[in-house]
Amino acid sequence: MFDRNGLRDMLARWPEFGEHVFETLLARRAWHEAEGHGVMRLIAPRGSRRAFEVRDLLERNLLPVRWYDVDTDAESAAMLDWLNIPRSETPVLVHATDVMLNPSAAQVARSLELRAQVDGQRFDLVVLGAGPAGLAAAVYAGSEGLRTFVAEAWAPGGQAGTSTRIENYLGFPSGVSGTELTRKATLQARRFDAVLSSFHRAVELADGPDGMLRVDLDDGQHVLARCLVMATGARWRELQADGVDRFRGAGVYHAAMATDAERARDEDVIVVGGGNSAGQAATHLASRARSVRVVVRGAALKSTMSHYLVDRIERSPRIEVMTETEVSALRGSSTVESVTLLDRRDGVVQDVAATAVFVMIGADPCTEAATGILAVDAAGYLLCGTGAAKSDGHLCWPLPDREPHLLETVRPGVFAAGDVRSGASNRVAGAVGDGGMVVRYAHEVLAG
């Protein structure tokens, strides 16, 4: 028998054996999920917003869950009757012998201990955000012996984690799903002793003792950082159309996970947006849906989407691209049933059938914790390097003896990586490159 440290020592001494162990664990988990072993059961009507939120939290934290529609699945309806649970108490989450009635995402996160207990601890590097940039920083920092903590507001992977197939990422000739990339990256980071915490959001940055930075978290805990990486990414903008608020989580979504395609089987869906994420969602949904309409405000996809995705969309008989068009209204009872589209060229309005609308338009940086501390550009993205050096006003570079490093913000030792920084490439490879680069600069700062 090996304890945690013994197993880690063995894997370090025999890395080839370690690769087999990790691959075996991944394969074992995939088999268990396919067979339904250890899979949590989420019982709720199809249009339940709370069930959608819980499922999204679990799936994106790589925890196996299946949604059973109580209105169409007789076994789940019978289980509710047997447990004497009324429909008004749905969603119901069944995990082993535990049954949670109408739980919020926060209650599920607490029950499954997604948040790490780190109150008052000191770290060489604290990373805010666990998208590709944050995970890359965690892997490289941990592998180089830096004590690293990663706080992720929702779940690892970021926007890339919801991609069904990333085909232009180096080393994966047949493509890689965002879920697979996230799963392997989180395992890799933990292998190097990085502490990862989900559903854990930084709410404030402040001066700490001994020249460290204090990071206050949303559950009352705090950590101290010698260096900090802002890898908080960006969030999709909301669709401005009648009915959006009513159907959010009940027909209006910001990601197309693998389970969404299955739920869209033989149905009509709409994807709003012209970037790569929208293209990946459209091609994925087209494998199951009866029809997919891609709605874009611009005149063509070629200026905003990678060529390979444009080509695939044009070749799909199930995908229709509607340029210079916007969604003006959504209608339905408990879920979306139809969508009103407006042609911006001639003002013609048409109603089309749709059971789901996937919105992937624009993005706003997630910088709330750094408000009033770090300088931003006109769009709200963090200024780094020469941008930080040129920043004026009260948020400016304070050191006269050196310029900020390439990814360093106006605060020495605080870096930005990935989509949250000004001038980012908005590609997975670029974010991973940022994550690796900040570790190099962090070493220089720590060396003093």
Model-derived regions, located:
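Cyclic-nucleotide recognition modules
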Residues: 1-21
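Intrinsically disordered or compositionally simple regulatory linkers and C-terminal tails
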Residues: 20-28
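Short, low-complexity disordered segments enriched in Ser/Pro/Gly and basic
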Residues: 33-39
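Short hydrophobic beta-strand segments
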Residues: 39-45, 267-271
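Beta1-alpha1 glycine-rich phosphate/pyrophosphate-binding loop at the start
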Residues: 42, 46-73, 83, 127-194, ...
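FAD-binding core/adjacent interface of flavoenzyme oxidoreductases
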Residues: 72, 76-128, 144, 161-162, ...
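Rossmann-like dinucleotide/flavin-binding elements
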Residues: 119-156, 240, 248, 254-307, ...
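A Rossmann-like FAD-binding core segment of flavoenzymes
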Residues: 182-218, 222-225, 230-232, 286-401, ...
